[in-house]
Amino acid sequence: MVENRLSSGLEDYLECIYNNIQNKGSVKAIDISRELNVSRASVTDALKRLASKGYISYERYGKINLLDTGIEKSQTVIEKHQILTTFFEKILKLSNKEATENACRIEHVITENAFIQLKGFLND
């Protein structure tokens, strides 16, 4: 069974995995290590936790695959990031850099209801 709540760090790993698969077709631990600027040991630990929670499958030193639940969770985090960035840029008139930095922080803690309301606000 998949535990719905992940730490912000694990959500960042999922987001990184998803984006790499979308952009390059595959992802390995070394790619994640470089992109997130973390040690290979940290990546291995995160991958083990994500696999145990049912979000990914992976082979040591091999490809990392997102399972359906991992894809769904990744897409949710990415959507939150995009909506928040849009809000900060278009409504609050923040620079892209500042909007992105704030979206990265808030995407992990915004409640589902607040996100739905924000999304509705931007779509009106």
Tell where the protein language model's regions lie, with residue ranges.
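DNA-binding alpha-helical recognition surfaces that contact promoter or target DNA
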Residues: 15, 45, 101
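Helix N-cap / loop-to-helix initiation motif
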Residues: 39, 93-97
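Short amphipathic alpha-helical/adjacent loop interface patches that line ligand
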Residues: 10, 81, 103
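C-terminal regulatory/oligomerization modules of transcriptional regulators
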Residues: 101-124
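N-terminal helix-turn-helix DNA-binding core of bacterial DNA-binding proteins
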Residues: 2-38
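Basic, amphipathic "hinge/linker" alpha-helix immediately C-terminal to the N-terminal HTH DNA-binding motif
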Residues: 62-81
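Alpha-helical linker/hinge and terminal dimerization helices associated
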Residues: 80-91
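Canonical helix-turn-helix DNA-binding module
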Residues: 29-60, 68
